[in-house]
């Protein structure tokens, strides 16, 4: 299986490490704008080869692990480059804008909108760890728009690395994630205000 990871940090790096552990005959190709990250990922054995978008035609699976603010511009180009049997999924923390951007793309059926809820405070290839996703929730949005055989391919990987799967629509996902991510800030603010009073 040819797995491409675009953005080799904590999430993308950890995911391909787990895929390599769970499956035989996996070759991981890395695409990254930061050459130092590519070199580090090669040295650490996270990826097997450096690649470019032109190589995406070889991919069986593409993991897009880049900042959400550039996903809208990059995902259409990524989908343009892949073959019909390749599943592309992102790991971004927001979904509505990404799903809206891709709704009329000719290869929308190749895309699966995902948000694995996992992480640490570290970043970069050296932050990648084994078993980051074990027993963690992966929220999938608009699953019905992805070709069934490609859903199956992705779900096989998610289950192999220990993820629990949940389904939501993109707007509800973003609303719930916004509430949860701001809850700690609100709690800290209110606690601080209480102490001051």
Which ranges hold each PLM region?
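Short beta->alpha hinge that forms the Motif I/post-I loop of the SAM-binding pocket
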Residues: 33-34, 66, 91-93
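Short, well-ordered alpha-helix to beta-strand connector turns
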Residues: 47, 59, 85, 135-136, ...
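Internal alpha-helical scaffold of NAD(P)-dependent oxidoreductase catalytic cores
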Residues: 132-197
């Amino acid at each position: 299986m040819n797995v491409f990871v675009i953005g080799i940090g904590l999430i993308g790096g950890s995911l391909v490490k787990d895929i390599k552990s769970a499956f035989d005959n996996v070759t991981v190709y890395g695409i990254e704008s930061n050459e130092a990250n590519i070199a580090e990922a090669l040295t650490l054995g996270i990826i097997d080869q450096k690649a470019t978008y032109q190589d995406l035609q070889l991919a069986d699976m593409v993991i897009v692990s880049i900042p959400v603010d550039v996903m809208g511009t990059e995902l259409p180009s990524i989908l343009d480059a892949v073959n019909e049997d390749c599943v592309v999924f992102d790991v971004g923390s927001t979904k509505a804008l990404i799903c809206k951007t891709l709704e009329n793309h000719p290869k929308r059926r190749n895309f699966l909108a995902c948000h694995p809820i996992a992480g640490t405070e570290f970043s970069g290839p050296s932050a990648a760890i084994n078993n980051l996703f074990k027993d963690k929730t992966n929220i999938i949005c608009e699953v019905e728009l992805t070709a069934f055989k490609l859903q199956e391919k992705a779900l096989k990987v998610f289950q192999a690395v220990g993820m629990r799967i949940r389904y939501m629509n993109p707007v509800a996902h973003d609303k719930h994630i916004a509430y949860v991510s701001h809850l700690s800030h609100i709690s800290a603010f209110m606690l601080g205000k209480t102490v001051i009073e």
